[in-house]
């Protein structure tokens, strides 16, 4: 890795004094093409909204530019980031620092970044991270991140160049389901390998449960401890990752109801969602059940909410907020014929949620190198719709909302090899100081 960085710097330095190339864009394009031939690693454009400490751009890119731990092993990214685009430049922006350290040019537009300064697509994959930054919030409480705008501008260059390369979209596809649906339809039309979604489903499971393919899941619950919408998304991705291979595969959602505050307790009391499942999920994390969704020992009090989904095939599933903890990701389900619920807690590793992105980076890099998504983007398409509809349902809590547009069916291949198995946290432990810089924490003896 070090020699490749030195090669890149050397080429850029040499080209910088070559009079034949009279523009910086031509210089960058030629340098990148030379390095592509010598390095033979997929060339990646990184497009992001904001790059500050612990932002998604930070915690993903630190595992793209250096080797990192995955399942306890030093892992080479296997790709080369050759261009950067930032949509905003807030205080604490890390773009220039990283650009200078790694010799990666920063471009003023998305088009320039994916063309690496030239006039046609010049990368083998695109990393789109539209998370964090100063963007407006609509009347439903949805942060209007420009994921669709990023997507449209990236794909426009692919169309013009008649070259279609793997694309990753961080988190949900869009705050608008119609846009999310259009994005997936476009990638299908042009055979663009498309991956999206959350880091949490790839986390270590404690206990390390597995749900057999074809299991007859009757009811499920996914619990988080964060804000409405932004953390509901991750809980939905956890939910789908656990239930999508049930008997018959995914069938989609026909109805949802949003409950908030006292409504949550009433819904639990009358059996709208299964309290035994909630207890099992919380016990997986804490070792005991709880009595109050809104106030846990050592945590600030919050107003709980629950989103109950009725699936086309009869499954019922609930997203439940419990307490205030950014690292709370718990799941439980009831399988027909089993006496006790099956439950687990998703352990994020040390340093809050930062280390979650090692496994996600590994999945994205696998996607870029193989040219095919390791798990279906339809999961995130369905989740995008479930989340958008939930925010609509929140405007009339306690009242069912029909979701005929979410009858989305899909099946997911086995991708368990892409999940963290916990061995990394034997090397990076809870006692390991978190780096306060662009540094993924790879132990010194492995560098």
Question: For the regions a protein language model found, what residue spans apply to each?
Answer:
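N-terminal secretory signal peptides and thylakoid transit peptides that target proteins
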Residues: 2-19
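Non-transmembrane alpha-helical segments in soluble domains
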Residues: 12, 61, 65, 96, ...
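C-terminal segment of classical bacterial N-terminal signal peptides
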Residues: 22-29
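N-terminal glycine-/serine-/threonine-rich beta1-alpha1-beta2 phosphate-ribose binding loop
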Residues: 31-167, 175-182, 188-190, 244-292, ...
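An acidic- and aromatic-residue-enriched active-site/binding cleft used to recognize and process polar
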Residues: 44, 131, 172-173, 197-200, ...
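Residue-level detector of anion-binding/catalytic polar loops
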Residues: 105, 193, 400
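A contiguous active-site-proximal alpha/beta segment in oxidoreductase catalytic domains
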Residues: 151-152, 161-243
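Contiguous beta-strand/loop segments that form the cofactor/metal-binding neighborhood of enzyme cores
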Residues: 221-224, 234-351, 355-378, 387-391, ...
């Amino acid at each position: 890795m070090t020699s490749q960085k030195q090669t890149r710097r050397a080429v850029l330095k040499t080209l910088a004094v070559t009079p034949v190339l009279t523009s910086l864009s031509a210089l960058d394009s030629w340098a990148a093409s030379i390095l592509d031939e010598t390095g033979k690693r997929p060339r990646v454009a990184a497009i992001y909204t904001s790059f500050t400490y612990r932002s998604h751009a930070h915690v993903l890119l630190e595992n793209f530019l250096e080797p990192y731990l995955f399942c306890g092993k030093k892992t080479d990214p296997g790709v080369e980031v050759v261009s950067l685009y930032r949509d905003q430049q807030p205080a604490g922006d890390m773009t220039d620092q990283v650009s200078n350290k790694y010799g990666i040019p920063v471009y003023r537009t998305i088009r320039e970044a994916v063309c690496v300064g030239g006039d046609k697509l010049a990368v083998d994959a695109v990393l789109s991270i539209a998370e964090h930054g100063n963007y407006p919030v609509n009347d439903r409480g949805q942060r209007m991140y420009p994921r669709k705008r990023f997507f449209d501008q990236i794909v426009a260059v692919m169309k013009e160049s008649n070259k279609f390369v793997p694309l990753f979209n961080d988190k949900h596809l869009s705050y608008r389901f119609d846009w999310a649906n259009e994005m997936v339809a476009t990638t299908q039309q042009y055979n663009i390998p498309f991956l999206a979604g959350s880091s949490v489903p790839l986390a270590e499971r404690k206990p390390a449960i597995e749900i057999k393919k074809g299991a007859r899941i009757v009811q499920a619950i996914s619990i988080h401890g964060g804000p409405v919408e932004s953390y509901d998304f991750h809980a939905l991705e956890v939910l789908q990752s656990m239930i999508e291979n049930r008997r018959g595969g995914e069938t989609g959602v026909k109805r949802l109801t949003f409950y908030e505050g006292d409504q949550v307790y009433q819904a639990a009391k009358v059996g709208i969602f299964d309290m035994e499942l909630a207890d099992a999920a919380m016990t997986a994390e804490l070792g005991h059940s709880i009595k109050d969704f809104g106030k846990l020992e050592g945590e600030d009090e919050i107003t709980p909410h629950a989103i109950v989904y009725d699936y086309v095939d009869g499954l019922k599933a609930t997203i439940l907020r419990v307490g205030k903890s950014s690292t709370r990701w718990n799941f439980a389900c009831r399988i027909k014929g089993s006496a006790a619920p099956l439950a687990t807690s998703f352990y994020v590793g040390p340093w809050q949620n930062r280390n979650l992105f090692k496994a996600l980076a590994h999945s994205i890099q696998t996607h870029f190198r193989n040219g095919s998504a390791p798990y279906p983007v339809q999961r995130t398409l369905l989740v995008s719709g479930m989340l958008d509809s939930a925010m609509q349902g929140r405007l009339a809590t306690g009242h069912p909302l029909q979701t005929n547009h979410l009858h989305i069916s899909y099946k997911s291949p086995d991708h368990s090899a892409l999940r963290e198995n916990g061995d990394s946290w034997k090397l990076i432990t809870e006692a390991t100081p978190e780096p306060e810089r662009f540094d993924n924490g790879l132990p010194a003896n492995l560098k």
